[in-house]
Structure formats: C-alpha cells, structure tokens
A protein has these predicted regions:
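Signal peptide processing junction and immediate N-terminal pro/mature segment
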Residues: 21-22
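Short aromatic-glycine motifs in intrinsically disordered, low-complexity regions
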Residues: 167-174
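Bacterial N-terminal signal peptides that target proteins for export
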Residues: 1-9
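Extracellular repeat-rich scaffold modules on cell surfaces
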Residues: 25-48, 64-157, 188-249
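N-terminal extracellular ligand-recognition/capping segment immediately after the signal peptide
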Residues: 50-68, 176
Length: 249
C-alpha cells in the first residue's frame, strides 16, 4: 500500500514511520530470492544473500512491520530502497551478519526534511560496509543513526555520489557507538560529503576500532541538522572521536 504524505503537515510527517525488526541470521538461512517490497505484518523469518547477489527491498509506505533476519555474504549486497516522499524513519531493530554491503537509500521529497535509518544496539557479527545514500540532491539529506557496539566491526560509507550535495549524508551517534571505519570522500572529486553529529543535546562518543586509514574529512559535531520527521533542530551535543585502533584520520 502506498502512502502519500503531505509533508507540510507535521501530523502527516509523524505518521510516516516504518519499523523493521531483524532476527539473528546465519549463512545457512534460506536464500532471500528475488527483489521484493514491504508487506504489512510480515512474520519473523531469517534469510541470507550469498553468491555475489544484489537484492533490493523497496519500502513503498510507512507504518509497516517487517520482522526478518539477514545474512549478507562477502561479495553480495542488499539495498533497502525508500520509495516514499521522504521524511520517514526506518528502524532496523536486530542483528545483521556477514561481510557484504548494506545500502540504505533515502527518498527526499521536501528540502526541509531528512529521512532517517536507525540501526539498533543488538549484538551483531556484521563486518561489511553500510552505505548511506539518497535519491536526488535535496538538502534535506539522509541520516543514519547508530548506537552501541553492535557495528564495531562494520564500516560506514557517507561518500554519496558525484552529484551529492555537501553534508547531505549524516551519521548520528546516540550516546555512544563503535565502528571499524568511516569514509566520506567522493571517489570522483575527492570532496568530503558527510557529517557526524550527536543525535541529541548530549555529547556522544564515536569509537573507531579499525586498523586502516580513515578517509573521513567532513564536519564532526556540527550543531545544525535536519532531523527526520521533526524537521530542523539544533542539538548542542558534540562528538568525542576516540581512535581505539591503529588507524589514522
């Protein structure tokens, strides 16, 4: 079911909320199969994407519950593609596993609002890449919010595309979070596209645990942001960047 959102109305924006609950998957879980879309009240299952496959899951409306686990094997990719008008929050409340690519694509239909993906604090064995992107170049942008140590072995990529506007891709830290690596350099121009912020008014810790060089050069702790369904907000909390590995920024 497609939900058309009048984004100018706060009530309508607040109604745009998608929850995705992910159980614990393994490489032995049944194959995901073909590209698909969200269905209402989907039962909990576990799936895997292996063998250098590329699979898309389209989100065509808000207010869905999708309970599944996902293993993404090395060389494979899984894309969650938001097809609404934007300004929605998609919660991924569970553990990923594998070494592949998880791409999160936000749709933005209004310049004053961002779309947000929230990855929970559940333990995870995922050591792949999480790539944040958006359709078009609207300044509302896309947000990835993380917390906890579940993604301590994963790398977040905020590099965007060649036509991505600067600072349109945001990594938000809720209290404290760990990552193996962080990248925001556009491979075509070398321009840094990302920004890292606290998700609220409190100062947040971002710990980088990897051993490679971090190619992040965007802003850290900037106070102005687009905050999904709430529109423009200005949190005062900054970021404590903790280099726990042997990597350098």
């Amino acid at each position: 079911m497609r939900l058309h959102l009048p984004i100018t109305l706060l009530a309508a924006v607040l109604a745009c909320y998608t929850s995705v609950s992910l159980a614990v998957p393994t490489s032995e879980s049944p194959a995901w199969g073909a590209n698909s879309t969200f269905n209402n009240n989907e039962p909990a299952n576990e799936y895997s994407v292996t063998g250098s496959q590329s699979v898309n899951l389209d989100v065509n409306s808000g207010n869905n519950n999708y309970s599944t686990g996902l293993y993404i094997g090395a060389g494979s990719s899984f894309t969650i593609n938001q097809n609404t008008n934007g300004a929605c929050t998609i919660n991924l409340n569970g553990a990923f596993a594998g070494e592949g690519n998880l791409t999160l694509v936000a749709a933005n239909g209004n310049a004053g609002y961002a779309s947000k993906f929230v990855l929970g604090s559940q333990e995870s064995s995922f050591s792949g890449n999480i790539i944040l992107s958006q359709k078009g170049t609207q300044p509302g942008g896309a947000i990835l919010q993380i917390t906890g140590t579940a993604l301590a072995n994963a790398t977040v990529d905020l590099s965007g595309s060649i036509n991505q506007s600067s600072s349109a891709l945001t990594l938000q830290i809720s209290n404290a979070a760990s990552l193996a690596g962080l990248n925001d350099a556009d491979g075509f121009s070398g321009t840094h596209k990302g920004r890292v912020q606290s998700a609220n008014s409190s100062r947040a810790n971002l710990t980088l645990t990897g051993n490679g060089n971090y190619t992040y050069g965007g802003s850290i702790g900037a106070t102005t942001q687009h905050s999904g369904v709430n529109g423009n907000t200005t949190p005062t909390g900054g970021i404590n960047l903790i280099m726990a590995g042997t990597g350098t920024q």
